[in-house]
């Protein structure tokens, strides 16, 4: 459960990044943790392909993890795929058989899939997944044959449907079920009930939705004859964000929250080492103070933002001491904090404040990270505020990550020992 929750957060970050692959801070963030990412585009005249291929090695499990992420709907071509709701016959173990069967009428009690999703996956297969003899090639051949390789297929909305159906096709083409997992976010059903019954158990599918997202059930509701399958994971969504219930940024927030819950559970059971508030190496020690404004402390998701920020500071700093986490606002002066930091043995003091201010008459707020760095003598080395406009309850972790990315650059200018590249690690 813990490993699944960990890779769900990675998949969610990648699903955000694939929408803007060349400027994505989510991809930059993943790269800083060792992920090698390449975006892929293609067009066969009918279907426009947009996905990303990433890989990273995890020494704790001795696995080379490959992550293939399909973009959700973002163009007219994508919506043509979505609206091609006619069902086509499903089956076959070669491209020729698949194409031939899809052209035939769906028999009574036969397995059938969404015509648009099927054409998209067919284009993916022809783009380099298989050769002219319908044998796995390249990346997918390597994954299938390498005992230390494992594949994660993922996507949001249309991307999730693509990942699901591609997973089914890979099994039909000879890839063992045990070699991969499919993780989807807000994805519609891909086939009818016969397809779900005959093929649903052929892949490991983690199907993530939420209590307010209409897309996963849209085909069943509006067109009928479609059925979901796989392991359902449903996030309980606040009614305050009903207009953003399908946003990938929302799924990212909730995946982080669920990951923290699972991490805490594993720590309480003794399966993971507790996160330390003190790490001392030969590098200078930095005392870290993180606080949120009084107006934010009552909001449940702010706890996740603080944990995310603290985790990132831990990874940036070779030597650190996490000081009082819930510092009362204005309870201490800067000089008081400096004295406490020096007494703890710190050479530097890093103060971070997390603020959220709602714009008048707007349904959005500005999530701001205020960061100040001082040496032990009180000399201010850098100070700055980094903000993002977000919904009050959606996109906060994404915004916090973007703010932290800028904040880290400011620290790098003053502290040459800041760590910007990290080894992939399942611990936290």
Segments and roles (model prediction):
Residues 189, 269-318, 419-428:
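A structural "domain/chain start" motif
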Residues 284-291, 334-360, 368:
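A short, hydrophobic beta-strand-centered structural micro-motif
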Residues 16-53:
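Extended, Lys/Arg-enriched charged tracts that mediate electrostatic binding to polyanionic substrates
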Residues 276-284, 343, 364, 374-428:
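C-terminal/domain-edge helix-coil "capping" segments
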Residues 155-159, 163:
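Gly/Ala-rich beta-loop-alpha elbow adjacent to hydrolase catalytic centers
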Residues 310-334:
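Short beta-strand->alpha-helix linker/helix-N-cap micro-motif
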Residues 64, 93-112, 119-154, 168-285:
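Serine hydrolase/lipase
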Residues 47-50, 59-100:
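Short, surface-exposed "cap/lid" segments of acyl-processing enzymes
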